[in-house]
């Protein structure tokens, strides 16, 4: 389809990014990207189930809590709480076009199949992009060495039904938009959704 870009189908160049944004192309996950994501996910699930050793941030806490083991039934809660605790940016709202770029770039990065996420998580990012559900992200605040943890947490809070978004030009609670747009809440599980 001409008006669709298949995320994970190849290199994402500046020219292609510009075309996706300027021509308002819809995003779909390429079949080969789904396979890569699922393969990595399957590995993570297997490793988590079979490993007697702690896996940092997956079966343990973070930072000074790295020696605290997390029970299998609390792994989803750990990931959800991580997103919530890191959503601490402040300042001015980032413009919607930048939010779209952030979603596109994160979906592309996840489509490479190196993170352990669920395919459905990446699909939800594409659903937000395609339906112009724009999470509200603020321009100040950082955590960690990369400095992107706070903005990314704000960007993806709405995937779990928390936080605010712009939808059809109005600021709304994410949970209400998820109900309206038939985009279902992603439930975080082991490692990054």
Language-model region placement:
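Structural motif
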Residues: 26, 53-56, 101, 134-135, ...
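Catalytic cores of large soluble enzymes that bind and process phosphate-bearing ligands
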Residues: 5-9, 28-36, 67-74, 90-94, ...
């Amino acid at each position: 389809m001409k008006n669709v870009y298949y995320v994970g189908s190849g290199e994402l160049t500046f020219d292609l990014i510009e075309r996706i944004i300027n021509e308002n192309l819809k995003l779909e996950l390429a079949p080969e990207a789904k396979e890569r994501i699922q393969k990595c996910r399957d590995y993570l699930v297997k490793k988590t189930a079979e490993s007697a050793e702690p896996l940092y941030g997956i079966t343990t806490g973070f930072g000074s809590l790295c020696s605290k083991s997390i029970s299998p039934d609390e792994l989803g809660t750990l990931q959800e709480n991580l997103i919530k605790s890191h959503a601490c940016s402040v300042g001015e709202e980032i413009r919607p076009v930048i939010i779209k770029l952030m979603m596109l770039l994160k979906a592309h990065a996840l489509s490479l199949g190196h993170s352990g996420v669920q395919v459905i998580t990446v699909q939800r990012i594409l659903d937000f992009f395609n339906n112009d559900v724009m999470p509200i992200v603020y321009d100040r605040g950082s955590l960690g060495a990369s400095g992107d943890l706070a903005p990314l947490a704000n960007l993806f809070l709405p995937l779990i039904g928390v936080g605010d978004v712009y939808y059809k030009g109005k600021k709304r609670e994410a949970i209400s938009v998820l109900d309206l747009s038939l985009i279902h809440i992603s439930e975080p599980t082991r490692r990054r959704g």
